[in-house]
Amino acid sequence: MADQKRLEAGEDQLKRLLAAADKLEIIDLSSNYMRGLDRLDGTLERSVFWDDAYCSYGTYEGGPEGFVEYCQSALKSHLSNHHFLGQINIEIEHNEAFGEVYYLSLIHI
């Protein structure tokens, strides 16, 4: 009985560690997305999207290739771009993640 409880506790800890690792990966993707915008690095920005992603941003609707072109084109005329990440709230449910990433952008035109 005691061994079973230890095993269950270990499984719970492993699940929590894997969820934490998944959340950190999402935070890294968010950071790389902002870095790609700030450095005008389309390759880095593109790397955060799945190939079959659909981007719905109001002013752009479509796939990641077009979205990256849209962003890089819009930002290249600026003197500087600085995106700062704020609170990041992520919930993991089975094989899906849901959440919000807040950011502040300072753009020098």
Regions found by a protein language model. Give the residues of each.
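Conserved small/polar residues in nucleotide/adenosyl-binding loops
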Residues: 107-109
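Short, low-complexity N-terminal intrinsically disordered segments enriched in polar/charged residues
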Residues: 1-35, 39, 47
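A solvent-exposed, acidic/Ser-Thr-rich amphipathic alpha-helical stretch
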Residues: 41-105
